[in-house]
C-alpha cells in the first residue's frame, strides 16, 4: 500500500499562520532561518508545490521478523512454525533444495489437496503440507531411520501423517500433489512410478547444476507433464510441473 506526500516551502511567518488555518497534521521536513519545508497528505490550493513523493507503507507482516531471545523465539501469529528434532535424516530446512520446496508448497499448493512426500527424510515437507491445509499426507522413504524420525517430528508438530518405509512403486494410491526432493539419478530410475502418484501438480528437486537440469527436462518430455515454474538457489534447481 502506498500514499502520496505533497511537499511545500513557505516563509516561517507564513507557515505558522498556515498551521493555524489548516487545522490538520503536517510533517516538518526542514526548518531554516527564513523558510520551512513541510509535507501534507493532500494537495493545497493556492500554494506552489515543490515535490510529490510516493511513500510505501510497511505493514506489520513485512516489518515483524522472528526474534530469538536465549532459548525463546518470538513469532507473529501468521507464521507457521515447524519443529524439527535434528537427526540423521535429511531435511532441517538449511539445504537450498528444502528451502525451495517449502517456498513452492507455500505458493503452489492448494488447501484441501491430498499429497505425497517421496523421500521424506525428517518429514519437514510433509509437515509443511499439513500446515498448509492438506487433507491427507503420505510420507515415504526407503531409510528406516528417516521413517522413524519423520513419525517423531509429526508427533512433535501435532500433525497426522501416514509414514511408510516404501518405494514409489509400492504405493497404490494417487494424490493431488507430490513433492520429490531426491538425488537426480533417482528420477531416471523411478520417474515412471512417480508420474503415477499425482494427478495435478508435483515438485521435483535435488537437481544440481545446469547439466543435470537439462537431463531432467529432457526426461520429462517423455511424460504428460508441463513445467510451470523453475526455481534455482546456489546451483540447485527445483521444478514445479503440472499434469496435462
What do the predicted segments below correspond to?
Residues 92-171:
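Conserved SAM/SAH cofactor-binding pocket of Class I
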Residues 103, 142-243:
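S-adenosylmethionine
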Residues 57-110:
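SAM-dependent Rossmann-like transferase core, predominantly class I methyltransferases
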Residues 44, 69, 79, 110, ...:
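Short, well-ordered coil/turn elements that cap or connect secondary structure elements
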Residues 26, 47-50, 136-137, 161, ...:
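Hydrophobic anchor at the start of a short beta-strand
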Residues 1-77:
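N-terminal auxiliary segments of SAM/dcSAM-dependent transferases
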Residues 33-37, 81, 201, 236-238:
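A generic structural signal for beta-strand entry/edge sites
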Amino acid at each position: 500500500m502506498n500514499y502520496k506526500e505533497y511537499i511545500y516551502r513557505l516563509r516561517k511567518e507564513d507557515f505558522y499562520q498556515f498551521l493555524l488555518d489548516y487545522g490538520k497534521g503536517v510533517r516538518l521536513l526542514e526548518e531554516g532561518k527564513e523558510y520551512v519545508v513541510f509535507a501534507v497528505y493532500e494537495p493545497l490550493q493556492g500554494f506552489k508545490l515543490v515535490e510529490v513523493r510516493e511513500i510505501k507503507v510497511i505493514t506489520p507482516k513485512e516489518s515483524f521478523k522472528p526474534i530469538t531471545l536465549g532459548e525463546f523465539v518470538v513469532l507473529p501469529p501468521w507464521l507457521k512454525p515447524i519443529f524439527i528434532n535434528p537427526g540423521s535424516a535429511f531435511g532441517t530446512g538449511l539445504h537450498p533444495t528444502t528451502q525451495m520446496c517449502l517456498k513452492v508448497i507455500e505458493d503452489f499448493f492448494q488447501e484441501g489437496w491430498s499429497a505425497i512426500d517421496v523421500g521424506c527424510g525428517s518429514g519437514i515437507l510433509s509437515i509443511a503440507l499439513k500446515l498448509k491445509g492438506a487433507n491427507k499426507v503420505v510420507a515415504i522413504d526407503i531409510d528406516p531411520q528417516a521413517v522413524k524420525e519423520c513419525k517423531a517430528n509429526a508427533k512433535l508438530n501435532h500433525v497426522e501423517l501416514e509414514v511408510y518405509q516404501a518405494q514409489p512403486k509400492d504405493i497404490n494410491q494417487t494424490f493431488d500433489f507430490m513433492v520429490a526432493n531426491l538425488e537426480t539419478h533417482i528420477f531416471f530410475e523411478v520417474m515412471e512410478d512417480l508420474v503415477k502418484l499425482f494427478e495435478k501438480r508435483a515438485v521435483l528437486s535435488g537437481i544440481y547444476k545446469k547439466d543435470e537440469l537439462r537431463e531432467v527436462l529432457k526426461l520429462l518430455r517423455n511424460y504428460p507433464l508441463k513445467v510451470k515454474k523453475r526455481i534455482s538457489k546456489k546451483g540447485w534447481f527445483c521444478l514445479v510441473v503440472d499434469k496435462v
